């Protein structure tokens, strides 16, 4: 869904909200699912989960030797309900900085997430929406669902 300078994405996961929140905020979990399409790894995943704390992700694809990095600063953290952080890619493929807001809502045995990205301009939003990021996001969300299932199985044992 697109509105002016926003992009929004909604997902649902079959896991309690706290576990989903942890999967978005703990480096040892994030690096297991936030990888994009097959062939990418995440050699750098640093998260200082506090207001004013920074995060840094670097993805690498061995063939053809591509690397992509991004980072930002946490502006608001309400565990396990809401995260607000800035976002800026190293290669600045869209102008300026974006502001990401992720909301986690528990609905029975499902957690619904809404990620809203506010770009500095409609141009930046348009560049991001044409980037093909949906493919990488879909692959990541599939991995996240698998990870959450594994975590719930381990917790039940």
Predicted regions and their residues:
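Hydrophobic pocket/interface hotspot
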Residues: 20-21, 30, 55-57, 74, ...
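Short, surface-exposed coil-to-beta transition loops
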Residues: 8, 42, 67-71, 95-100
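A short, structured loop/turn motif at beta-sheet edges
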Residues: 17-18, 48-50, 75-82, 103-112
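Glycine-rich portal/gate segments that line the openings of hydrophobic small-molecule binding cavities
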Residues: 41-88
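Hydrophobic ligand-binding cavity/cleft-lining segments
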Residues: 1-40
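Beta-strand/loop substructures that line and gate deep hydrophobic ligand-binding cavities in soluble
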Residues: 84-138
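Residue-level preference for beta-strand/loop junctions
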Residues: 3-5, 51, 66, 96, ...
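Short, highly charged C-terminal tails/helix-capping segments
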Residues: 148-157
């Amino acid at each position: 869904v697109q509105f002016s300078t926003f992009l929004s994405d909604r997902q649902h996961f079959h896991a309690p909200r706290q576990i989903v929140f942890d999967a978005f905020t703990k480096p040892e979990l994030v690096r297991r699912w936030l990888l994009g399409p097959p062939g990418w790894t995440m050699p750098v995943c640093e998260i200082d989960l506090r207001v004013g704390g920074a995060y840094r992700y670097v993805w690498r694809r061995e063939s053809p030797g591509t690397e992509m990095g991004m980072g930002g600063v946490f502006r608001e953290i309400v565990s396990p309900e809401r995260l607000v952080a800035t976002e800026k890619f190293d290669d600045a493929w869209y102008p300026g900085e974006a502001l990401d807001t992720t909301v986690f809502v528990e609905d029975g045995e499902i957690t619904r997430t809404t990620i809203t990205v506010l770009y500095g301009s409609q141009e930046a939003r348009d560049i991001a929406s044409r980037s093909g990021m949906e493919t990488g996001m879909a692959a990541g969300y599939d991995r996240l669902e698998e990870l959450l299932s594994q975590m719930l199985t381990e917790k039940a044992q």
